């Protein structure tokens, strides 16, 4: 993580105190690695995906931070920031009622490249986590559904929400994350702009862009693409940008 040299990081598919990841608070580990005091984890489910899990109830925390670090083992998305966070936000995006067969990587005993296998995957609840920063930006992390059509509906809802928060907080919105949509679809027929064009999946030979930095307004000339780095900890490549 340190090699990313970032002030703000948005991550998806994060474990929070799950047995498969040695009961670690992975968000705190990430925040510590980049020197971030402010971090938040937004669970999408309680339990382990693909194994035993349940949807959140009214008794479960929707946003876990350093001052509310109490929750059962969960899985979701997170933001860590070295820039002070003024306010955290959460939006429920729902999930597809049907799953899909997906091609997923598994470790290979004979090659450095993962083996590929197809499995049927049920869609989990999706959400967005926002952080209004002290520098005039609101960054919003998400991981949209892999089901075609459902992800477009979720993104439309997310964009409306992002603009609403931007107006309320007098900040500029930035949507980050795995949108599960190929090139240009996230910005088609909209005023949103994709700040970086970079294939991100799979990490061992990226052929398609699923991950994006989206902004609303004329900020493209203030962005420097810092290039991607193969971290070895994900099947996606991270996008890195410097925004003035």
Where in this protein do the model-derived segments appear?
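Active-site regions of metal-assisted phosphoester/phosphodiester hydrolases
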Residues: 1-8, 17, 21-22, 32-33, ...
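Phosphate-group recognition and catalysis centered on beta-loop-alpha active-site segments
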Residues: 14
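Short acidic, glycine/proline-enriched helix-loop-strand junctions
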Residues: 25-28, 34-37
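Surface-exposed patches in mature extracellular/periplasmic domains of secreted proteins
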Residues: 38-44
């Amino acid at each position: 993580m340190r090699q990313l040299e970032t002030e703000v990081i948005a991550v998806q598919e994060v474990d929070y105190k799950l047995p498969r990841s040695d009961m670690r608070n992975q968000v705190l580990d990430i925040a510590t690695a980049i020197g971030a005091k402010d971090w938040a984890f937004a669970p999408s489910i309680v339990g382990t995906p693909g194994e035993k899990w349940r949807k959140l109830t009214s008794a479960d925390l929707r946003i876990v931070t350093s001052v509310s670090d109490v929750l059962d083992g969960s899985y979701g998305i997170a933001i860590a920031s070295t820039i002070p966070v003024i306010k955290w936000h959460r939006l429920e995006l729902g999930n597809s009622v049907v799953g899909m067969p997906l091609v997923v990587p598994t470790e290979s005993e004979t090659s450095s490249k993962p083996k590929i296998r197809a499995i049927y995957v049920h869609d989990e609840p999706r959400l967005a986590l926002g952080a209004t920063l002290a520098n005039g930006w609101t960054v919003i992390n998400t991981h949209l559904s892999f089901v075609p059509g459902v992800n477009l509906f979720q993104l439309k809802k997310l964009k409306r929400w992002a603009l609403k928060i931007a107006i309320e907080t007098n900040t500029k919105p930035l949507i980050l994350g795995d949108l599960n949509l190929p090139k240009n679809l996230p910005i088609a027929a909209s005023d949103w702009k994709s700040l970086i064009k970079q294939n991100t999946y799979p990490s061992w030979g990226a052929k398609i862009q699923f991950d994006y930095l989206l902004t609303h307004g004329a900020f493209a000339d203030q962005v420097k693409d810092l290039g991607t780095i193969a971290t070895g900890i994900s099947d996606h490549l991270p996008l890195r940008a410097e925004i003035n």
